[in-house]
């Protein structure tokens, strides 16, 4: 997936989450003016079902957002890998320093998740 496609999907997912959260807040504050108990029970039941549905969609959106951010991080990390060096250049590499750098990058990424 290209960077532009990932960012577009990220924007769509955040917009969807915003809409679902607004709908969830609207459903949570829904009141009825009916006096009959059966009607109120029906409205409350329908309201709870709608809240459950909106919450489920919100959770799915957050899961999609987590997956997208992981893909973006992986893509960024893979683009940071340098080109393959010649044997002379490989001898001059400090492997201990590279190991420490890799461990610090991995720990930083893991701590963000």
UniProtKB/Swiss-Prot annotation:
Keyword Transcription regulation among UniProt keywords: yes
Q: Which terms are listed as keywords in the entry?
A: Activator, Nucleus, Transcription, Transcription regulation
Q: Which Pfam families match?
A: Med22
Q: Which domain of life is it from?
A: Eukaryota
The biological processes this protein is annotated with in GO are:
positive regulation of transcription elongation by RNA polymerase II; positive regulation of transcription initiation by RNA polymerase II; RNA polymerase II preinitiation complex assembly
Keyword field contains DNA-binding: no
Q: Which GO terms describe its cellular component?
A: core mediator complex; mediator complex
Q: Localized where?
A: Nucleus
The Gene Ontology terms for molecular function here are: transcription coregulator activity
Q: Which InterPro entries match?
A: Med22, Med22_Saccharomyce
List the signal peptide residues: none
Q: Where is this chain primarily localised?
A: nucleus
The record's similarity note reads:
Belongs to the Mediator complex subunit 22 family.
Q: What task does this protein carry out?
A: Component of the Mediator complex, a coactivator involved in the regulated transcription of nearly all RNA polymerase II-dependent genes. Mediator functions as a bridge to convey information from gene-specific regulatory proteins to the basal RNA polymerase II transcription machinery. Mediator is recruited to promoters by direct interactions with regulatory proteins and serves as a scaffold for the assembly of a functional preinitiation complex with RNA polymerase II and the general transcription factors.
Q: How does it assemble?
A: Component of the Mediator complex.
Q: What is this protein called?
A: Mediator of RNA polymerase II transcription subunit 22
């Amino acid at each position: 997936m290209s960077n532009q496609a990932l960012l577009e999907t990220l924007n769509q997912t955040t917009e969807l989450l915003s809409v679902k959260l607004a709908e969830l807040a609207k459903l949570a504050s829904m009141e009825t003016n009916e006096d009959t108990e059966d009607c109120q029970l029906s409205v409350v039941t329908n309201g709870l079902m709608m809240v459950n549905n909106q919450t489920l969609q919100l959770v799915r959106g957050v899961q999609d957002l987590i997956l997208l951010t992981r893909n973006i991080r992986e893509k960024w990390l893979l683009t940071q890998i340098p080109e393959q060096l010649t044997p002379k250049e490989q001898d001059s590499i400090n492997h201990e320093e590279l190991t420490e750098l890799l461990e610090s990058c991995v720990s930083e990424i893991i701590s963000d998740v």
